[in-house]
Amino acid sequence: MYNFNEAEYRTNLTRQIDTFGQGVELAKEITKDGYSNIFFIAVGGTVAMMMHFEEIAKQLTTIPVYAEQAGEIVLTGHRHLNRDSLIIMGSKSGDTKETVAAAKWIKDNYGCRIASMVISKESPLGRLTDYQLPLVVFKGVEYEYLSVFGLFYGLLHLHNDFPQINAFEEQLKKLPDLLVAAQAKFDAPAAKIAARYYQSPYLMWIGGGELWGEIYLFTMCILEEMQWMKTKSIKSSEFFHGTLELVDENTDVFLVKSVGAARALDDRVERFLNQYGKNVVIIDIKDYMGDIDDAFAPILAPVFSTAVLNGRLSKYFEKNTGHDLNMRRYYRQFDY
């Protein structure tokens, strides 16, 4: 596969999966001390990743779970935020200014416990963190999901909402093989897609359910930030309430199909696109998940989505555009 170090990828995934038990132990400590609700708070791609947990929580638990934008919550507040709230934050660098400011605001105003997905405990966010969620590498969103899984599903298990936690952990052990296989399967399609669409003036991306955060993340953080490509992301549930009018024979449209309860919405969009679109790419994440148990497929779908989209398609866009994924005009280049 192009620009892919399989041995390193397998090693890092295994190291990250091995931290699952640490997250469960944190969940035991937090549950023993008690908590009233869970707030996921971050910005950008990290809060996009967190949207998945909010969506899954609606379906699995009565624990109130919120995903909030760090730059907004310090201005608007939240009536459900209280001293007993558990805050889950994330900033790989540990110095994302809005996230650090939100952590300080939370500590100063509420004194909440904060669990953070951060590499260094000595970073600005790390120093405000009570529980560090292990993160073994800087790049790769799949590692971010895996970093949070132990704590989140440990909390749900201890709340009697996720009795299948041991079976879930066994599923995680399959991921090194299955994620490599998924990327190998999508490698040739990714090369063809990128070669055809890398010069597109406008890319529409549609998705929903447990994958909505992934669609938002890939369009904004990868295609826009890292490739300077103009995109539109829209939920499958919202597509028929305006955005459908933009579809014609010249519109480049991507639909990423989810595997959970909202899949029927993706199916409806697919039928419309097949009838009225000309330049349509359908990426069905279910096709890349191997023998993952159906019970865990919605939980793990974003891990596979990020593996094929970020892991394969972004690399081929980079190859075709000649635009290094690390190049920025503005982001972190100066104060603004």
Label every PLM stretch briefly.
Residues 36-171, 256-283:
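Glycine-rich phosphate-binding loops that contact phosphosugars or nucleotide phosphates
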Residues 213-281:
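Internal helical hairpin/lid segments
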Residues 27-31, 75-82, 243-248:
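Short amphipathic alpha-helix with an adjacent loop that forms part of the alpha/beta core around
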Residues 2-7, 269-336:
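Phosphate-moiety recognition in structured ligand-binding domains
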Residues 81-83, 147-152, 247-249, 293-301:
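Short, surface-exposed amphipathic charged segments that create phosphate/polyanion-binding patches used
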